[in-house]
Curated annotation (Swiss-Prot):
The modification N5-methylglutamine is found at residue 248. It comes from Hyphomonas neptunium (strain ATCC 15444). Belongs to the prokaryotic/mitochondrial release factor family. Peptide chain release factor 2 directs the termination of translation in response to the peptide chain termination codons UGA and UAA. Keywords: Cytoplasm, Methylation, Protein biosynthesis. Methylated by PrmC. Methylation increases the termination efficiency of RF2. InterPro entries: PCRF, Pep_chain_release_fac_I, Pep_chain_release_fac_I_sf, PrfB. One of its GO terms (cellular component) is cytoplasm. This is Peptide chain release factor 2. PANTHER family: CLASS I PEPTIDE CHAIN RELEASE FACTOR, PEPTIDE CHAIN RELEASE FACTOR 2. The lineage of its organism: Bacteria, Pseudomonadati, Pseudomonadota, Alphaproteobacteria, Hyphomonadales. Transmembrane segments: none annotated. The keyword Cytoplasm applies.
Length: 368
């Protein structure tokens, strides 16, 4: 057995054992059986909200148990596969590639197990705002929107566009997405901040290099179990006509809704629904989410300066730099993680940055 394959097997074996312990295996399998039995009762969906929470818990347990079982099977099968592949370089290469993928899944699962914040497992709202710079920044905002949509799609997450304002010539001024999937908020919360792009502008006839900025804000979708008190008198409601894609209802009625929480100057808006009532309900959910995120930021501020009060979108407040010319490099300014695969990153391959940010935040919390 080659040293590389032996090392991969040991890593997978260690990860599987760690994940098994974190699951509390016997308790987890028993709870999964209980939830499965409950879900088969005729009256299970009488309380839809409670039923959905139980189904999410069941799916999370089932996924965790299945992953451990798969990793343990990979380890158990490896010696036999090694024997079959003896002397066959192609089969050995395939086995090593399979084990590398398993080791990568295990490493990510170890990190995901560290997502222990009270809202880390939730869906999230992700808002993108173009900085100053007109068309350049607005085009950059649309590139970021596509990056996050592609990331979500690759993970099997759902994405809903709740609000979007088109740019004057190209791109978007702002967009709000709802990312739906297990740990969506936990993974994406570190994306909050200013993202900087350096490139030769496609809008500049002189082909000069331009620097553009867009900001990203992330907040968890919260349910009624998390209490967020909002005084209705503190909220201003504005309605306006929806814009952008939306079919026959666009621009016919004032169906879009904007809410402004006056004490914090927090603004949310929604135009995805077909009626003002739907958009108002969703906007209130978004506002509760944003105010809850502000509270989380206050709690994190002592340990993490990146969650200090909002600042202007500019050079001094970046979390990541994307350079396309004169060289190609994406670099996270907090973790120092970087890659020259700019096209891959802009196509949604951002897991290396998310994992590094999570690992750094966990390490910092342990040192605090």
């Amino acid at each position: 057995m080659s040293a590389e394959i032996r090392s991969l097997i040991e890593k997978i074996e260690s990860s599987a054992a760690l994940l098994r312990r974190r699951l509390d295996w016997d308790t987890a399998t028993k709870r999964l059986d209980e939830l499965t039995a409950l879900s088969e009762r005729p009256n299970f969906w009488d309380d839809p909200q409670e039923a959905q929470a139980m189904m999410r818990e069941r799916q999370k347990l089932a996924d965790g148990i299945a992953l451990v079982q798969t990793l343990e099977k990979d380890v158990a099968d490896a010696p036999e596969l090694m024997e079959l592949a003896e002397g066959d370089a192609s089969m050995l290469a395939d086995l090593e590639a399979t084990l590398r993928r398993a080791a990568a899944r295990a490493a990510e699962a170890e990190l995901a197990a560290l997502l222990s914040g009270e809202a880390d497992g939730n869906d999230c709202y992700l808002q993108i705002n173009a900085g100053e710079g007109g068309t350049e920044s607005q085009d950059w905002a649309s590139i970021l929107r596509r990056m996050y949509v592609r990331w979500a799609e690759k993970r099997g997450y759902g994405v809903e566009l709740l609000d979007e304002r088109d740019g004057e010539e190209a791109g978007i001024k702002s967009a709000t997405l709802q990312i739906k999937g297990e740990n969506a908020y936990g993974w994406l919360k570190s994306e909050q901040g200013v993202h900087r792009l350096v490139r030769i502008s496609p809008f500049d006839s002189s082909a000069r290099r331009h620097t553009s900025f867009s900001s990203v804000a992330v907040s968890p979708v919260i349910d009624d179990k998390i209490d967020v008190e909002i005084n209705p008198s503190d909220v201003r409601t504005d309605t306006y006509r929806a814009s952008g894609a939306g079919g026959q209802h666009v621009n016919r009625t004032d169906s879009a809704v904007r809410l402004t929480h006056i004490p914090t100057n927090t603004v949310v808006q929604c135009q995805a629904g077909r009626s003002q009532h739907q958009n108002r309900d969703e906007a209130w959910k978004m506002l509760r989410s944003k105010l809850y995120e502000l509270e989380l930021q206050k709690r994190r501020a002592v340990a993490d300066a990146q969650y200090a009060d909002k600042s202007a979108i500019g050079f001094g407040h970046q979390i990541r730099s994307y350079v396309l010319q004169p060289y190609q490099m994406v670099k996270d300014l907090r973790t120092e993680v970087e890659t020259s695969d700019t096209s891959g990153v802009l196509d949604g391959d951002i897991d290396r940055f998310l994992s590094a940010a999570l690992a750094a935040s966990v390490s910092k919390d342990q040192d605090a």
